[in-house]
Amino acid sequence: MAPRILLCGDPLGRLNQLFKRVQSVSKSAGPFDALICVGQFFPDSPEILDEFLDYVEGRAQVPIPTYFTGDYGVVAPKILSTTSKKAENQGFKMDGLEVCHNLFWLRGSGKFSLHGLSVAYLSGRQSSESQFGKYSQDDVDALRALAEEPGGVDLFLTNEWPAGVTNRAAVSDIPVGISDSSCSDSTVSELVMEVKPRYHIAGSMGVFYAREPYLNAESTHVTRFIGLAQVGNKNKQKFLHALSPTPTSTMSPAELSAKPPKTTLWPYNLQDGAAESKKRPNDSDSDSQYWRYDVPKRQKSGSQGEKLCFKFVCSGSCPRGEDCHFQHNAEAREQCRRGVCLDLIIKGKCEKGPECSYKHEFQDESSIQRKPRSENANRSKECWFCLSSPSVESHLIVSVGESFYCALPKGSLVEDHILIIPIEHLPNTLVLSPEVESELSRYQNGLRNCYKSQGNDAVFFELVSKRVSHANLQVVPVPSSRARLLPNIFSLAAEKLGFKLVTKKFNDSTDGRKYLQKEYNAALGLFYVELPDGTVLSHTLEENEVFPAQFGREVLAGLLKIPDRADWRNCKISQEEEAKLAEDFKKQFQEFDPCQ
C-alpha cells in the first residue's frame, strides 16, 4: 500500500491551527503516515510564542510524525541550537534531528527514506543574517552529490520556489503576482534539474499552485510542482495537501514513464525568444542556471574568457547541447568525476579551507587550459597539509620529524587531540615504505606514553578515501577508565548507521598495521581504528558508499560525554588560543617526542 503523506506550507508557528486541521483531515480521509512542512516553520512574531513552545516543551503533543525545513523565525536559533547539541542528534543524520516527540528538523540538505519514499531536501533560504535559516554552498554541493546516486527521488522539499517554474505553464493557472523572479531562487532551479524528483514541494510564496506536470531532461518520468500557502492565510489559500505516491523503487519503467494529460516541456530552458520576453525581463536568468563563475584568466582560451557550463562539469551532459552559450570542457568534467573540488576547477581556488572534503590538486597531467606547473608545485600550493603550502597553519605544529609532523587540528575534540601527518603528499598512512612506517610507529608510541602519563590511553583512527588527498592519522586521548568501552561503542554506532566493523585483536600494534595494509584496497576505501588494547576495528567502504567523514570523532564525543563538540565547527577558537594550546602540548610532549 502506498504511503499517505500530508504536505503543508509555512506554519509560521501556528501549530494549534495546523494540527487541528491535520486531525480533521485524518478523521475524514486518514490515517496519514507523516506531515511534511515547507516554508517558515517558526513564528513571525512573539505573539504566538507560548502556543508554539507548548509543543516544543512537551505541554502539548504533536499528533503525527512531522518534518520541517523552514528553520527560521522567532526563537529558531535558540531552539535549534539546543536541538543540535542533544546526544541523540549527534552523528550522521539525514532523516531529521528530533526537536521533541514527533517533530523533526531536516537540517542543511540530505536524502532519506520515509515509508519507502525517497525524500531529498534543501533546508533554509538563499540568504539570511542568522546562523539558522540559511543554506550553504556545502549544502548545495552535498545535494548535488546525492543526486548522482542510483535510484530516483520521489519528493524534493525546498522552502523557496525555483526560478522559472511558471515558464511554459498555462497562464490561466498561474496565481497573480508570483511570476516575479525576485521571489524565487535560481539555485533551487539548478538543483531540481539535477535531482529530477517526481514531486517538488515548496512554500514561502503565500499561495497554492499545482503546476501541470513537466518533462525532465535525460529522464523519462515527469515532475509535478506543488507550491503551498501559509497556515491561516487570510485569502483562504490551500495550505494542506494530501499525497499518496507509489515509491519509485516499486514502479515499473512503463509506470514511471507515463505522461499525464497537459504535460508540458521542461520549464527551465526556454529558447523561444517571444515566449521568453513575455515571461522574463531578459535571457540572463535562464543562462545563470548553467554557470557559476567566470573562468579565471589563467583558464581562458583566447580573449573570449568563456564561462564553464556548470551542468556539463557536474554531470557530463547539458540539455542545451550545441545551443548552450557556455564552455563544455571535457577535461574539467573529468576532474570533477575524479573528486576534485568544483571551486578549484571553475574558480581556480577553494576558499573553504579544511572544511572542504574534496581534492585540491588535479588528478592527471592535464592542466585544464592552465599554465603547466609541476606536480609538486601544484600539490604544495593547493593542499592544506603540505608544509610548503602557503595555506598550512604553522602555529598548530607541535613536532616535525623526517617523514611526519604532528599538529593540533582546527576545532580539536579535546585539548590534546593530535594529527600525525606525512610530510610527503600521500593519500593515506597505509602506503608507507618500511622506513617511513618505522617513524610513524615511533610517533604513535611517543603519544601513547605521553597520554599514559596523564592517565589516558590513545585512540588512533583514519578515513582512507578517494576524497582525502593528504593523509592525517587522528589521535585522541581517552581516560584509561573508559577505554574498555571503546569496542562496543564503536560497533553500536556503526550498526546504527547501517554498517559493521570487523574486529581483530593483536598483541603488537605493528601486526595490526600490517593487517590493515593487507586489507586496504586502493580501488575502494577504508575506515579503521587502533584501540589501546591492540584491537583493530575496520570497515571497507563499498563502491559509491557515502561514509560519514566525522564518524570517529562523533563516536569519541559520545564516549567522552561532550556531544556538542562532535562537529569541529562548534569548537573553533582564535588563532592566539590555538597557538597557546600548541605550545602547552609541546611542553607536555617534549620528553616523549621521538624527534627531539
Curated annotation (Swiss-Prot):
Pfam families xref list:
CwfJ_C_1, CwfJ_C_2
Chain spans, region Disordered:
243-263, 272-291
Query: Keyword DNA-binding on this protein?
Result: yes
Give the InterPro entries listed for this entry. Cwf19-like, Cwf19-like_C_dom-1, Cwf19-like_C_dom-2, HIT-like_sf, Znf_CCCH, Znf_CCCH_sf
> Which GO molecular function annotation, any one, does this entry have?
DNA binding
Q: Where are the zinc fingers (C3H1-type)?
A: 303-331, 335-363
Protein name per Swiss-Prot or TrEMBL: Zinc finger CCCH domain-containing protein 64
Q: Which CDD domains match?
A: MPP_CWF19_N
Swiss-Prot/TrEMBL keywords = DNA-binding, Metal-binding, Repeat, Zinc, Zinc-finger
